[in-house]
Amino acid sequence: STAEPSVSASPTLPAGSRVLTASDTRTGVNARVTVTPAKGWIRLAVKAQGIDPGEHCRLTAITRSGDRVAAGSWVVAAKPDPDAPPVSGSAVVAPDDLAAVEIATVAGKVLVTVRA
């Protein structure tokens, strides 16, 4: 018998979610950030490429007035895995007040800024 190809539907984003993308030619890093609103805060799901293996990174939400709110941190895997789940984060930033999401090293080097 012949197996039929399986078709999987793209996951549906929750209402009000936005997908933001950016690339930084200086660092070679590109990122895709899904922003999901909650009441008075946001959830972030980040897929980034071009960051050195083993790099310690932090995720920061930036408000329209320039306030910086920590949203998470992680260590980049030693071996890139395109099937790895996105890095998750959250920040107490009103969904409509988000201006950008920044990925930087813990030492402070900005790798990419994704504008909202």
Segments (PLM) and residue ranges:
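N-terminal, charged amphipathic alpha-helical interaction modules
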Residues: 1-3
